[in-house]
């Protein structure tokens, strides 16, 4: 079961930023099964100040069909609130984190649409306690390259042309990104990744 929320709440409140993607509610379902209370906001239907009023325990930025800078408030939200709230970005959300800290998002060397890849990792962050590699489903045509100094790559896929970044964490903030889809039923460790995010001991 997920840890209790802040400020005496019995349930952990998770703001889910929906980038207009069909996978969002699979993530919402997983969060609910893990004992959290997901609250879904569309990426262009809120103001940043409303995040402070909600005061969530965690923020999850969903996958989506566009680029990070077309994803509503996803990038500005990371830039403003990464020091204050734990954030997990999934697929487009991962790219938004990369862009927010100065990384470059470019067309991926291989188009991935429902393909399963072995994901290698170093066991840190949301990958704590997972086998390496583990199979995960990928749906993406973009990838983060030239990862900024603030982010540490902790997961990758071995491609014909080299490694593709599949995950990173911030050096100082509780901010994590995964390029693959943990909510896919073919991603064996998906729910454990979300559980690790919810149970991160970071407190503000």
Swiss-Prot record:
Organism domain of life: Bacteria
Chain segments annotated as coiled-coil in the UniProt record: none
One GO BP annotation of this record: L-tryptophan biosynthetic process
An annotated Gene Ontology molecular function: anthranilate synthase activity
E.C. code: 4.1.3.27
Binding positions (L-glutamine): 64-66, 95, 141-142
Record field: catalytic activity: chorismate + L-glutamine = anthranilate + pyruvate + L-glutamate + H(+)
The keyword Amino-acid biosynthesis is annotated on this UniProt entry: yes
Active-site residues annotated for this sequence: 91 (nucleophile), 181 (for gatase activity), 183 (for gatase activity)
Role this protein plays: Part of a heterotetrameric complex that catalyzes the two-step biosynthesis of anthranilate, an intermediate in the biosynthesis of L-tryptophan. In the first step, the glutamine-binding beta subunit (TrpG) of anthranilate synthase (AS) provides the glutamine amidotransferase activity which generates ammonia as a substrate that, along with chorismate, is used in the second step, catalyzed by the large alpha subunit of AS (TrpE) to produce anthranilate. In the absence of TrpG, TrpE can synthesize anthranilate directly from chorismate and high concentrations of ammonia.
Name of the protein in question: Anthranilate synthase component 2
Native source organism of the sequence: Thermus thermophilus (strain ATCC 27634 / DSM 579 / HB8)
């Amino acid at each position: 079961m997920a840890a209790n929320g802040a400020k005496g709440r019995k349930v952990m409140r998770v703001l889910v930023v929906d980038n207009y993607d069909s996978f969002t509610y699979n993530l919402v379902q997983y969060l609910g099964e893990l004992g959290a209370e997901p609250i879904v906001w569309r990426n262009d239907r809120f103001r940043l100040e409303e995040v402070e009023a909600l005061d969530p325990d965690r923020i999850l930025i969903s996958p989506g069909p566009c680029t990070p800078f077309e994803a509503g408030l996803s990038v500005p939200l990371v830039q403003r609130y990464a020091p204050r709230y734990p954030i997990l970005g999934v697929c487009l959300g991962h790219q938004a984190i990369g862009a927010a800290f100065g990384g470059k998002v470019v067309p991926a060397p291989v188009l991935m649409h429902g393909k399963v890849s072995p994901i290698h990792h170093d066991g840190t962050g949301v990958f704590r306690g997972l086998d390496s590699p583990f199979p995960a489903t990928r749906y993406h045509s973009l990838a983060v390259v030239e990862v900024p100094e603030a982010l540490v790559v902790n997961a990758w896929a071995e491609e014909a042309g080299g490694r593709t970044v599949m995950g990173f964490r911030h050096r100082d903030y509780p901010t994590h990104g995964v390029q693959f889809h943990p909510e896919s039923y073919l991603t064996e460790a998906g729910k454990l990744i979300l559980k690790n995010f919810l149970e991160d001991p970071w407190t503000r």
